[in-house]
A protein has these predicted regions:
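Transmembrane and membrane-interface helices of multi-pass
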Residues: 2-196
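Soluble catalytic regions of membrane-associated enzymes that act on cell-envelope
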Residues: 179-243
């Protein structure tokens, strides 16, 4: 028992171990929101490889804390960000079938206008109180959370953090490319709702950020559209003459 305790205490001295543990816990919370229940806790057992990949995505963002002395505060900010996205998805799925994606940010003005149709006044008040409580909690952490004692030069501290973050990013990127290449996950989703449950919230949401649909053609311009319209008008005129 003492050996196990000693081993745990030893590995806990490594920065990335902290980041990995917090990322695993955060990924489980996110998936519980994604699946609208505690079935999210079964995700690592149902799809272990994909769970690790989603955790690495979150861990890449959590690794930002390694650049700061107020690490608990930064870990908390990143956690609030991911939980906020997952909670938004949870709320959206209660009123529509398609999950929350990056494209929804482009529609935020329209969403605010029709928010009353999907969320009651009481729910809006509760959400506002929750936001205020979270902000207050973050301010408290900023002021009271302990700072990391740094015994090395700032340049070495930043370089060490950068190396660790790059390693995590390369692990996430490499695993993502491998899973996409082997077909274990997809980047384009036929059924968005099923994809979120099968491939995880983190992967699907990040995919919606990176891939926002069909790219604009190089030939696309106002002049080109005008010429295309004229061609279609000419076709309609010729067709009417024949009839």
């Amino acid at each position: 028992m003492n050996r196990v305790k000693t081993f745990v205490q030893k590995i806990w001295t490594y920065d990335l171990v902290h980041t990995a543990v917090y990322s695993i816990v955060l990924e489980l919370i996110v998936e519980c929101f994604n699946r609208r229940g505690i079935m999210g806790l079964a995700f690592p057992f149902m799809h272990p490889i994909i769970f690790i990949y989603n955790t690495l995505i979150i861990m890449t963002s959590m690794a930002l804390a390694l650049f700061f002395r107020r690490r608990m505060f930064v870990y908390s900010v990143v956690s609030v960000f991911w939980i906020g996205l997952a909670l938004t998805n949870f709320i959206i799925l209660s009123s529509r079938k398609t999950p929350f994606t990056a494209m929804d940010f482009y529609l935020i003005k329209d969403a605010i206008k029709v928010a009353g149709l999907y969320v009651s006044v009481i729910q809006i008040i509760l959400i506002a109180l929750l936001v205020i409580a979270v902000i207050a909690g973050l301010v408290f952490l900023w002021r009271k959370a302990p700072k990391l004692e740094v015994t090395i030069k700032k340049t070495k501290f930043v370089a060490y953090a950068a190396v660790q973050m790059i390693l995590v990013f390369l692990a996430a990127y490499g695993m993502g490319i491998t899973l996409l290449f082997t077909g274990a996950v997809e980047g384009h989703f036929g059924n968005l709702a099923q994809a979120y449950k099968k491939y995880g919230f983190s992967h699907c949401f990040v995919s919606s950020v990176l891939d926002r649909g069909i790219k604009k053609s190089g030939d696309y311009s106002e002049e080109y559209m005008d010429s295309l319209k004229n061609d279609l008008d000419n076709v309609d005129v010729e067709a009417s003459k024949k009839t």
